[in-house]
Swiss-Prot record:
InterPro entries: Aa-tRNA-synt_II (IPR004364), aa-tRNA-synth_II (IPR006195), aa-tRNA-synth_II/BPL/LPL (IPR045864), Asp-tRNA-ligase_1 (IPR004524), Asp-tRNA-ligase_1_N (IPR047089), Asp/Asn-tRNA-synth_IIb (IPR002312), AspRS_core (IPR047090), GAD-like_sf (IPR004115)
Name of the protein in question: Aspartate--tRNA(Asp/Asn) ligase
NCBIfam families: aspS_bact (TIGR00459), PRK00476.1 (NF001750)
Function (record text): Aspartyl-tRNA synthetase with relaxed tRNA specificity since it is able to aspartylate not only its cognate tRNA(Asp) but also tRNA(Asn). Reaction proceeds in two steps: L-aspartate is first activated by ATP to form Asp-AMP and then transferred to the acceptor end of tRNA(Asp/Asn).
One Gene Ontology CC term in the entry: cytoplasm
The organism of origin for this protein: Synechococcus sp. (strain JA-3-3Ab) (Cyanobacteria bacterium Yellowstone A-Prime)
């Protein structure tokens, strides 16, 4: 057999070459980013994950490599050995970390060629816009590009910072929980896996490690974390994937204050380590009720104002029928004051058929009433104008802090509908009017969520977070209206994490199961192992989980989590690279005792 080829080891990554290496001989490996022929001297940009360095092939100084340099093309894989030189001062490139140096290619070896036309340019300087479908189909090429390569490295840095903080400073241990488990109702549909050795029975892929991490607390692990893979079979949006990654944590003998304080220090450590940003502590807090009242959302973007104002008392017994009807039916009247909106927003946009009308009706509102604040008067439709006395007009201006030139937009109806529609309108106008400062960074906690919400389709209560969340101790007398000891972390209007103190007493857990409609038999069948564990000495405990993909997305300044995941699925839950999901052979289905009833077309 021929002897194995021995190549010199890499001495540096391309992006690490600096003026300190001038005069040294280095060996580099990477991809050709660009090739330029300038009057007989060939310049090559060599790229790896660390960056780009310029190579020089000169027929006078490096004759052995010059001929090969003429053959290389973009994305050829090469090895180069050569001496580091300082670039002429007039050819410094301030855009590159290596822009003051170049490597004279004394040896050049082509390791791999490109055998067909590239589907798109990998070079970052081409400025080529590539459809996402093409990028996902050739993801291995897309990941060579500077932006995605940087995002993957940022993701690694975030995970490394998490591990160092939790393990080295806080005494957490990383424990892997099962991927093949049993199906339990947690909201979204499970991905099911048939068991070949137990015909007719199924595993489910975990939507979260929730139950196992609670059992780890029963087991005395005390402080657990995991970079956990989770799976949910749900309709996808820009910020959702069928498989995703969580930073999952659980802690014994810690109350809510201690958990929030520890997590603030964790977030501060991450931001300082990967972005060099010092976050102020403590983070602001809003209760769920405050967030809904002021922003119409349980994940408010607090970088700008435009807060909602409840003016329901002002319109009690109003002669304006729309408002009177809403209040008689137990609803609310709220105002979204828009400073300077009188000139910026036309009546056409507010009335039926207008874009703002369509926006609020999309979320259940019947429409928008409005008042334009003019010097010395309020301008609106006759019926609303006539329903307001001069004293009420003044009270309205005081409540909303409105000035001449402002626009008041009204929502009337059930509180949930008014909050949702005006909250969405607030975000839309905040962006449209340029009220959101780009570089602002607002993190806050939302606390005191309701324990349950009503599911109108199924005519029953269901857990707002999950049925293992502990009720507030002051609300145990009536669980149906209880507050939850739950908390969400919101960053610029995006929920990046959420958690709670957990139920650790069997009798309370059984009451919660009963409240969401599980019979004792159903509770034992689905969660008997958890209920039994609570009989053997369970510590008070709580935890939190962060959407790691979403956290990295925000740190990277991206708009979609697909741009911070190496091999994401499309919004149709497909992998365009491998063709998954795909059909399987009849033999495989037979072994699993499974038959497909799907009929194409």
């Amino acid at each position: 057999m021929p002897a194995a080829i021995r190549r010199p080891p890499r001495s540096l990554y391309c992006g690490q070459v600096r003026p300190a290496h001038i005069g040294q001989t280095v060996t580099l490996y990477g991809w050709i980013d660009r090739r330029r022929d300038h009057g007989g001297v060939i310049f090559l940009d060599l790229r790896d994950r660390s960056g780009i360095v310029q190579l020089v092939a000169d027929p006078q100084k490096t004759p052995l490599s010059y001929e090969l340099a003429g053959q290389v093309r973009s994305e050829y894989v090469v090895r180069v050995t050569g001496t580091v030189h300082q670039r002429p001062s007039d050819s410094f490139n301030p855009r590159l970390a290596t822009g003051e140096v170049e490597v004279y290619a004394e040896e050049l070896e082509i390791l791999s060629r490109v055998g067909k036309q590239l589907p798109f340019s990998v070079s970052g300087e081409e400025g080529e816009e590539v459809r996402e479908e093409i990028r996902l189909r050739y993801r291995y090429l897309d990941l060579r590009r500077e932006r995605l390569s940087r995002n993957l490295q940022l993701r690694h840095q975030v995970i490394k910072a998490i591990r160092r903080f939790l393990e080295d400073e806080e005494g957490f241990i990383e424990v892997e929980t099962p991927i093949l488990t049993r199906s339990t109702p947690e909201g979204a549909r499970d991905y099911l896996v048939p068991s070949r050795v137990n015909p007719g029975e199924w595993f489910a892929l975990p939507q979260s490690p929730q139950l196992f991490k609670q059992l780890l607390m029963v087991a005395g692990v005390d402080r657990y974390y995991q970079i956990a893979r989770c799976f949910r079979d749900e309709d996808l949006r820009a910020d959702r994937q069928p498989e995703f990654t969580q930073l999952d944590m659980e802690m014994s003998f810690m109350d809510q204050e201690a958990i929030l304080e520890l997590n603030e220090r964790l977030l501060c450590h991450i931001f300082k380590t990967v972005k060099g940003i010092d976050l102020p502590r403590p983070f602001p807090r809003l209760t769920y009720a405050e967030a809904m009242a002021r922003y119409g959302s349980d994940k408010p973007d607090t970088r700008f104002g435009l807060e909602l104002v409840d003016v329901s008392p002002l319109f009690q017994g109003s002669g304006f029928k729309v408002f009177a009807k809403a209040l008689q039916e137990g609803g609310v009247i709220k105002v979204l004051p828009v400073p300077g909106g009188d000139e910026k927003i036309s009546n056409t946009r507010i009335k039926p058929g207008g874009d703002l009308f369509k926006l609020v009706t999309q979320y259940g509102a019947g429409g928008l009433a409005f008042i334009r604040v003019r010097p010395g008067s309020l301008d609106t439709i006759g019926a609303l104008k006539e329903s307001l006395s001069p004293e009420q007009e003044q009270q309205l201006l005081q409540l909303t802090n409105a000035k001449p030139g402002d626009l008041l937009l009204f929502g009337a109806g059930p509180a949930a509908v008014v909050n949702e529609s005006l909250g969405r309108l607030r975000l839309h106008l905040g962006q449209e009017l340029g009220l959101i400062p780009e570089n602002a960074l607002n993190l806050l906690w939302i606390t005191d969520f309701p324990l349950f919400e009503f599911n109108a389709e199924e005519n029953r209560l269901e857990a707002l977070h999950h049925p293992f969340t502990a009720p507030h101790p002051d609300d145990l007398a009536d669980l149906k209206t209880a507050r939850a000891q739950a908390y969400d972390l919101v960053w610029n209007g995006v929920e990046v994490g959420g958690g709670s103190l957990r139920i650790y007493q069997r009798e309370i857990q059984e009451q919660v199961f009963q409240t969401i409609g599980l019979t004792p038999e159903q509770a034992r069948d689905k969660f008997g192992f958890l209920l039994e564990a609570f009989e053997y000495g369970t510590p008070p405990h709580g935890g939190i989980a962060y959407g790691l993909d979403r956290l990295v997305m925000l740190l990277a300044g991206e708009d979609s989590i697909r741009d911070v995941i190496a091999f994401p699925k499309t919004q149709q839950a497909r992998c365009l690279l491998t063709g998954a999901p795909s059909g399987v052979e009849a033999k495989q289905l037979k072994e699993l005792h499974v038959a497909s009833t799907y009929q194409p077309g």
